[in-house]
């Protein structure tokens, strides 16, 4: 079994050899640095009112591997890696993880003051392969937020790639920034 490796950033390119995908962005995007990535777990927990869910986030074996924000300040993408464990890793496939997540995601988003309009299981063509994902439409303070989460499972780890935009039409072009890397 191969060892988990963090993704690398070089110029406008992010690559994660472990999961076999990369992303190339132009200078209208800004990648978060290591300190910003570390602070994201705490910031995510701070948005949540539910103490149990907040504790779960802080205790989870998970981290942000990449985050980038478009110049508009609201369109963004991130890669969160989570250790689902050797036992669960053998049992859980992407489809099951998505189905289980959809059961709790609307409540989790509501705890972060997002009003979920729709949340559906989708197949995503991501970096040259089909993966299970979740397409969510929420509103925040009256504004639309479209999120596409793609699940990429390798061994006992899953990378969840989240694309977020106020315009649903932006999600497909954002997917196009990702490509397969040789592993």
Residue ranges and their predicted role:
Residues 1-63, 113, 118-120, 140-144, ...:
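N-terminal targeting sequences that direct proteins away from the cytosol to non-cytosolic compartments
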